[in-house]
């Protein structure tokens, strides 16, 4: 395993192990996620990349049989401790899932929903926040005249951008994207990829993808995982052109996975 030469990381993972019951899903993971960069996790199905992503906002805490051991340091604090406030963590670390998941409410309320949980804004300030989030997600021009229509009225690609807008509306520091383009057509995928590149100006972005070309296009750093282990972690260009490990080379050249 090699670590990217960035110090200190926005997220620092130290000796992380994760278990689904007795199944050891992540094994001694160590890496630093660089601030205001895009980091991609790649690897075959079941390698642990989505599991690792979900430890960053403790999504596993919903399931008592799942547990993490080790440290994940965010802004100097280990988020894996029992003292960690889950709601505040998820305000700081936003997440967008594989399939678009708009709430059953208007486009406007999809954006405003999370904001209302953490802030008391005037109507004018909320209007401004909704416009800001939709603009950041490259969706404002397509929705500004139909904000009170259902989020379900949007196309699949628009719904995913709505979910990204919803995620950034509460102004997190980190944005997690779990296969955000897997259910989208190539045109919508292209727009999401452009958006990911733009978002790193304001956020630390971590993306899980099966699409190695997507990782190569969008990310600054890439981690290759296999069977719960971090095999290699490097600058994206270096990992794809000069992999240090044979397992990495075999995967990116299609020899297995």
Curated annotation (Swiss-Prot):
Recorded GO MF terms: ATP binding; ATP hydrolysis activity; ATPase-coupled phosphate ion transmembrane transporter activity
Main subcellular localisation: membrane
Reactions that this protein is recorded to catalyse: phosphate(out) + ATP + H2O = ADP + 2 phosphate(in) + H(+)
Enzyme class, UniProt record, top EC level: translocase
Entry keywords, A to Z: ATP-binding, Cell inner membrane, Cell membrane, Membrane, Nucleotide-binding, Phosphate transport, Translocase, Transport
Sequence ranges assigned to domain ABC transporter in this UniProt record: 11-252
EC numbers, comma separated: 7.3.2.1
Compartments, record wording: Cell inner membrane
Single GO BP term: phosphate ion transmembrane transport
Domain of life: Bacteria
Pfam families in alphabetical order: ABC_tran (PF00005)
Binding site for ATP: 43-50
Recorded GO CC terms: plasma membrane
Annotated S-S bridges: none
Signal peptide: none
Membrane topology: Peripheral membrane protein
Family to which the UniProt record says this protein belongs: Belongs to the ABC transporter superfamily. Phosphate importer (TC 3.A.1.7) family.
Subunit-level organization: The complex is composed of two ATP-binding proteins (PstB), two transmembrane proteins (PstC and PstA) and a solute-binding protein (PstS).
Record PANTHER family: ABC TRANSPORTER I FAMILY MEMBER 17 (PTHR43423), PHOSPHATE IMPORT ATP-BINDING PROTEIN PSTB (PTHR43423:SF3)
NCBIfam families listed in its UniProt record: 3a0107s01c2
Role played: Part of the ABC transporter complex PstSACB involved in phosphate import. Responsible for energy coupling to the transport system.
Protein name: Phosphate import ATP-binding protein PstB
Protein source organism: Enterobacter cloacae
Taxonomic lineage from the root: Bacteria, Pseudomonadati, Pseudomonadota, Gammaproteobacteria, Enterobacterales
């Amino acid at each position: 395993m090699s670590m990217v030469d960035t110090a200190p990381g926005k997220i620092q993972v130290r000796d992380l192990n994760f278990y689904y019951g007795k199944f050891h899903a992540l094994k001694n993971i160590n890496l630093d996620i660089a601030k205001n960069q895009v980091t991609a996790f790649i690897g075959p199905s079941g390698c642990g990349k989505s599991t690792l992503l979900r430890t960053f906002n403790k999504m596993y805490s919903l399931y008592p049989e799942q547990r993490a051991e080790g440290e994940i340091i965010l802004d100097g604090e280990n988020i894996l401790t029992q003292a960690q406030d889950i709601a505040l963590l998820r305000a700081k670390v936003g997440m967008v899932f594989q399939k678009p998941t708009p709430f059953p409410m208007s486009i406007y309320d999809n954006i405003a929903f999370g904001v209302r949980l953490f802030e008391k804004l005037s109507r004018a300030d909320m209007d401004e926040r909704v416009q800001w989030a939709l603009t950041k997600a490259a969706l404002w021009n397509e929705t500004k005249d139909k904000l009170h229509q259902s989020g379900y009225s949007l196309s699949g690609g628009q719904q995913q951008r709505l979910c990204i807008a919803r995620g950034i509306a509460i102004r997190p520091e980190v944005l997690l994207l779990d296969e955000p383009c897997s259910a989208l057509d190539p045109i919508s995928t292209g727009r999401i990829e452009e958006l990911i590149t733009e978002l790193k100006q304001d956020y630390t972005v971590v993306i899980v993808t099966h699409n190695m070309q997507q990782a190569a296009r969008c990310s600054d750093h890439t981690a290759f995982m296999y069977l719960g282990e971090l095999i290699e972690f490097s600058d994206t260009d270096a990992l794809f052109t000069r992999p240090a490990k044979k397992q990495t080379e075999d995967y990116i050249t299609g020899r297995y996975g």
